[in-house]
């Protein structure tokens, strides 16, 4: 069967997602004596950003502009000089409690230090998931007994095997704010001839790998991030964040889009736990670029994910905030990307600096421990380069610095402090790394990832190492 062209797959994707976007049933009239919630506010991203600065008492003029990654002639062009890349070389002490007690045992990590790190990320970086997030109810259409031509996630092309495609929608209870509907869109593709429950790789945004996963006998799940939360600041009074806030602007510690997308992945995993065709103990999470950031956040916060493929996540993902290279904290605190983060994160692009953050990316990676986590990038330079914006070296440094947490929990880290050249993989441990020569994609690393991940997804299921920290 011929491979599906990318344009055809995209059109099919749009058709499927549109078919899943039916509004939830209209809520009935409010009970006698209860006041209806106010209408959701309509704001531009700039207006919403300014409201957050007002709450933080930060003048807009005090927010530092981020570097320019496109124009080398710009006065604020990104730094690519390694001599200037580490103005704050000292990272937060990952294995030291707030009370200055060294963390020398797994028990102390699980009981004390890990919860401390989670609290820092909640309060200062990604924001808090509300305690009263509405319930999600999953609905499914009859399975599509199609072959590869009915595939999904077009970069995978023709999987070459018969498949079962399930189109699902997770309807979020909006009875408290009927003006906002959230319908989480998920497409699950399974090998039709599987002898029993199969592992599944869940991917944010359809980043590819479907063909390789299905060829291995695994399933592939496409999760639509924008069906959970829009990827812009103007959407913060809608989506799951807006629904929880009844259409009103965020408070400083409220969650941003990265945390909301990760929450949506957990709710999709809730569904997979009910599907008898899926081995829910062997579900991985993956994403590329901003969705690579989301995949790392999901992996860090949701211990039910068995393995992670973190693609080109850069600043806000696997890259050290304290590195002065490529994209910076100041890019994430500007009005174009602030919606990914908690409002409180804006402080670190204004009156505070990245060195004032109580945590850094090495600790986000450490929250994934002891589970296998593969960090993927394209090469910074040379033929087929991804470029320098994502700071490959800063992410490698973070992975190296996360290694002690993996070793503390009895697992192997990268095994070296020297970043290997492109197309040389570090895959001997539960922390893995590879750069390819194929640009801004995970595609050329998928085969290496699958061979590495099979060591974990093909073995006995392991119980989660800790209870899920976010509410249903």
Regions found by a protein language model. Name each.
Residues 195-280, 314-324:
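Cap/lid segment of the alpha/beta-hydrolase catalytic domain
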Residues 369-390, 436-438:
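Conserved strand-to-loop "acid loop" that flanks and positions the catalytic carboxylate
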Residues 307-364, 391-418:
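Mobile cap/lid helix-loop segments that gate and shape the active-site cleft of serine hydrolases
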Residues 278-289:
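Alpha/beta-hydrolase fold nucleophile elbow
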């Amino acid at each position: 069967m011929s491979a599906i062209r990318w344009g055809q797959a995209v059109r099919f994707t749009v058709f499927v997602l549109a078919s899943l976007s039916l509004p939830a049933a209209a809520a009935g009239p409010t009970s006698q004596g209860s006041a209806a919630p106010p209408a959701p506010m309509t704001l531009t991203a700039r207006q919403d950003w300014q409201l957050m600065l007002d709450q933080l008492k930060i003048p807009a003029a005090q927010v530092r502009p981020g570097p320019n990654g496109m124009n080398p002639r710009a006065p604020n062009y990104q730094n690519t000089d390694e001599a200037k890349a580490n103005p704050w070389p000292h990272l937060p002490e990952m294995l030291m409690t707030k009370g200055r007690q060294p963390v020398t045992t797994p028990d102390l990590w699980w009981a004390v230090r890990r919860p401390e790190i989670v609290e820092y990320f909640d309060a200062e970086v990604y924001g808090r998931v509300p305690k009263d997030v509405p319930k999600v109810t999953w609905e499914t259409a009859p399975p599509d007994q199609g072959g590869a031509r009915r595939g999904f996630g077009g970069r995978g092309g023709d999987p070459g095997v018969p498949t079962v495609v399930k189109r699902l929608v997770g309807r979020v209870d909006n009875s408290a704010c009927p003006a906002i509907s959230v319908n989480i869109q998920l497409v699950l593709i399974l090998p039709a001839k599987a002898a029993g429950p199969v592992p599944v790789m869940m991917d944010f945004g359809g980043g590819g790998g479907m063909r390789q996963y299905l060829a291995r006998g695994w399933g592939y799940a496409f999760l639509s991030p924008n069906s959970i939360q829009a990827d812009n600041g103007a959407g913060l009074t809608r989506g799951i964040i807006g629904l929880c806030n009844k259409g009103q602007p965020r408070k400083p510690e409220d969650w941003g889009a990265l945390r909301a997308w990760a929450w949506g992945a957990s709710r999709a995993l809730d569904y997979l736990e009910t599907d008898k065709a899926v081995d829910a103990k062997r579900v991985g999470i993956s994403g590329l670029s901003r969705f690579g950031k989301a995949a790392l956040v999901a992996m860090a916060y949701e211990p039910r994910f068995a393995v992670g493929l973190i693609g080109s996540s850069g600043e806000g993902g696997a890259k050290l905030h304290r590195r002065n290279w490529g994209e910076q904290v100041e890019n994430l605190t500007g009005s174009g990307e602030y919606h990914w983060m908690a409002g409180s994160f804006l402080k670190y692009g204004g009156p505070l600096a990245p060195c004032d953050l109580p945590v850094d990316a090495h600790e986000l990676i450490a929250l994934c421990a002891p589970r296998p986590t593969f960090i993927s990038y394209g090469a910074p330079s040379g033929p087929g380069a991804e470029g320098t914006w994502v700071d490959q070296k800063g992410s490698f440094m973070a992975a190296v610095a996360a290694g002690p947490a993996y070793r503390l929990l009895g697992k192997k880290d990268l095994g070296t402090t020297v970043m290997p050249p492109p197309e040389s993989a570090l895959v001997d441990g539960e922390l893995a790394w590879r750069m390819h020569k194929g640009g801004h994609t995970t595609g050329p690393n998928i085969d290496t990832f699958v061979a590495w991940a099979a060591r974990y997804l093909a073995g006995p299921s392991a119980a989660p190492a800790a209870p899920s920290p976010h509410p249903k």
